[in-house]
Amino acid sequence: MFTGIVVFLIYAVVAHLFSYYFKKNRVLHSQKWGLNICCGKTDGGGVNADIVQHKELPNFRLVEDIYNLPFANKTFDCVLCSHTLEHVDDPKSFFSELERVGEKVTLVLPPLYDLFAAFNIFEHKVIFLTFKKEHHSLPLYITLPFARTLHDKWGQLNRA
């Protein structure tokens, strides 16, 4: 029993590190992004935009409403949205807005094999039903059980 728990925890940690650090960074550094939306502390090489400025980044734009971005239609050839859709109230509307401002949208999402990220009810509102990290369309998703109740009562750990 104890050995099984240890093996599970080792798997979960290794899968999370592989998914979040290796695979995410591989996508981020694969090209220069016209728009890196909800950029956090990462520089995508073009316009970096977020609802909060986490650190000094080149070409940073503060965005007030992710569902109504301050850019004209098809302003950007390529848009990167990494580890954000799982935090928002309405992933479909946000994805539609990304498609409006970008020719090609790339989503980086927590895959199901990354158990720590995929089932994180303290930060995430939805779980994407995918084993892939990178997407160009919105995959199927479901609302995480108890996440909204938890966020309403005690707040969301990381707000998007």
Regions found by a protein language model. Name each.
Residues 92-160:
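S-adenosyl-L-methionine-dependent methyltransferase catalytic module, highlighting the catalytic core
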Residues 11, 20-21, 67, 113, ...:
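Sequence-level detector for tyrosine residue identity
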Residues 32-114:
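Conserved SAM-binding loop
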